[in-house]
Amino acid sequence: RLHNLSGRTRRLSAIGYVEWVMGDLRAKSRMHVVTERDHQTGALLARNAYSTDFGGRMAFFDTDADGCGWTCDRLEFIGRNGSLHAPAALRRERLDSRLGAGLDPCAAIQVPLLLAAGDRSETTFRLGAGRNRKETLALARSRQGAHEAIDALDAVRIHWRNVLATVQVRTPDPALDALANGWLVYQTLGCRYLARSGYYQSGGAFGFRDQLQDALALVHARPDLTREHLLLCAAHQFTEGDVMHWWHPPQGRGVRTRCSDDYLWLPQGACRYLEVTGDASVLDEVVGYIEGRAVTPEEEGYYDMPTPSTQRGTLYAHCVLALERGCRLLGERGLPLMGSGDWNDGMNRVGDQQRGESVWLGFFLHDTLRRFIGLANAHGDAPRAEWCQQQAESLRQNLEQHAWDGAWYRRAWFDNGAPLGSSQNQECRIDSISQSWSVLSGVAAPERATQALDSLYTHLVRKDAQLIQLLDPPFDQTTEDPGYIRGYVPGVRENGGQYTHAAVWAAMAFAQQGDAVRAWELAGMINPLNHALDPEAVQTYRVEPYVLAADVYAVSPHVGRGGWTWYTGSAGWMYRLLVESLLGIRREGDRLSLAPCLPDHWPSFELSYRFGRSFYEFVVTRTAQGQATLHVDGMLQPDLTVLLRDDGHHYRVALDLCAPPG
């Protein structure tokens, strides 16, 4: 939209511009992209007949304006040795209408505008694609007219307002409200789950553990999607119990690896979905397995398209198979094998000879087994529940016997038996996720839990830079080879920078311990809005302050600089930290309660929770002397829970917590 406020007539051009990829990498595909123009609609078209999976598809770019100039030649548009900062086309009145094969393909449409003083103008550009030429042109025709664009934009706004309305908060911290009420769910659902793409990585693949974690963060806003994704992931499990590390739809090509944690996210996810929704029917859904050749000892993994297996099983059976595999692949200390990396893919050579063991994975497996006990009992499988109890207890004993280093928990053991994340190490003496998950899993004895988090806070929280390191000191000169993590500059990304995923887990662990001061301190460090409060901070952080960044650098001269924004799973975990760990949402089926971990200076906050067509409006105060009280529409609820009813009503909930000390 343009509004001429200059006080005189202006002659302008509005130019819409796209660069065609039509494949995975533009450098590979551009020689195969052929462009043309449909004379009836004026749409510029592009196709890549050599695309392995999408050879028949065609894309279009067009506008409703008349008298337009256009070109499909990027060289013509930007000029020789030119750039998009100052395209050569802007120095000419008309584009040269070049199209066909053998060009550096693009689509540029130049709309001439003549605006008298006070005039307004609106130009709409459309970008789309169809399965073939006929469908593409039909789509282009059906979307002609400015009203189509306006209606589509309105529909998008209505959709997102509906999704984001599930949980809304009003707290004394406006930076928290901005993230919790919109940006984090939008980042998780829009970028991570639907697009699976970002400026730092435009991949499009489903990562088994990656999008499962995203879907679990969406269980309040989109439980249907969480359910659907559990079944999708189960359909990418091999008959041996391992899974595809990632795959590209729609064909399903991807990688099979010896990564040791992927498959355990399936039972972990099933447990969370049932804990929150109470929907046990998903466990009886029947899903097929896949088959493929085994990963050889000489490989970390291989890329291929698996074949569907004749074997099928319920989601419950898929989860059990994953747990059995996890409990079978143990090392000499009775802890899970590291394989070609656990959650930290960069530690891909710690245990690639199938002898190295992962302490973090021991905590994670214990947590998953512990959660599965209740699920198995509810499913009527008491023997499996007992088996989970025995396996979890064995893991707990082995972790407490072998993993404690004296002041914190170790991270792993190399294939040769050397420890990692130990005071014996010159590099990576302490790793964050072993400390946080020792608490989150319930393994650590109380005194060790406190000491482990104290060590994390002392050694990894950088108050000067407002960041939380993943590990310290970074890998640099060590004789042991941990893997490709050492390829990062010390202090960057996983190699000693802030890896925000792990930073959030640290804050969650402090909240679980009831340490509100440190939990909120760390949450404030992670919140990107707090890294852009003044021009100096903006110049330090240098990335978008409204979405989570996967990394914050911890090495001079880039200390405090963010990296890898948007496409990071830390967004979903940050959402869970804010609305669950800190503001205290606890939903168990049709029961909802709040158990917040609040700063002492907060007198109150408000929270709205949507259940179906109903809304529950919480007002949380802190004036109670003695026991907390909860009223729903004035009626006392002795168990401090709210019964959720999908009846279209607005319920008023008053929760009065005990007054803070002092």
Locations of the language-model features?
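Short Pro-Gly-centered flexible turn/kink motifs
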Residues: R10, L113-R131, L365-T368
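Catalytic cores of carbohydrate-active enzymes
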Residues: Y17, K28, H32, M244-H245, ...
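Low-complexity, Ser/Thr/Pro/Gly-enriched N-terminal "stalk/linker" regions
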Residues: D154-Q201, L225-E228, L232, R325, ...
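Active-site acid/base region of carbohydrate-active enzymes
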Residues: R170-G182, C233-A234, F238, L264-W265, ...
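Non-catalytic C-terminal accessory modules of carbohydrate-active enzymes
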Residues: T458-K463, D476, Y488-R493, M508-G662
